[in-house]
């Protein structure tokens, strides 16, 4: 198992944003590992941007009429398993992955930050297949 395996939930403390925003602790969901150390991933957020007209249930929320999609993780619902620590993982708050916030990241940048102790990377678990 590698940290950047598809479906892995990681935690950076802190995460350094490409746009220069203040670094802060952040979860990181690996969606796909591509060639040349590129990772397709999302930075889940606790900010709820689901329109009030859409029912909020754990799972994929998609409304093509208004071009809205996200995955909603209900707080404290076990969503992943950490094989190393033999424990389940759940987000402590309602958490959202929005389609428009999926990005490409260069894994080599993370490797350098970890090697120089600029950040601590913690493996939280691998998503359950649902």
Regions found by a protein language model. Name each.
Residues 15-19:
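Short, charged beta-turn/beta-strand-edge "cap" motif at the junction between a beta-strand
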Residues 6-7:
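Loop/turn positions that initiate beta-strands
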């Amino acid at each position: 198992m590698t940290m950047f395996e598809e479906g892995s939930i990681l935690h950076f403390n802190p995460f350094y944003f490409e746009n220069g925003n203040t670094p802060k602790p952040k979860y990181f969901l690996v969606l796909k590992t591509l060639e040349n150390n590129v990772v397709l991933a999302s930075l889940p957020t606790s900010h709820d941007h689901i329109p009030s007209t859409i029912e909020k249930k754990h799972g994929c929320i998609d409304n093509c009429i208004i071009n809205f999609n996200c995955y909603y993780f209900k707080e404290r619902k076990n969503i992943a398993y950490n094989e190393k620590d033999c424990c389940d993982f759940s987000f402590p708050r309602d958490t959202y992955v929005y389609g428009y916030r999926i990005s490409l990241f260069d894994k080599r940048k993370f490797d350098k930050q970890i090697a120089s102790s600029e950040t601590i990377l913690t493996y939280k678990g691998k998503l359950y297949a649902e």
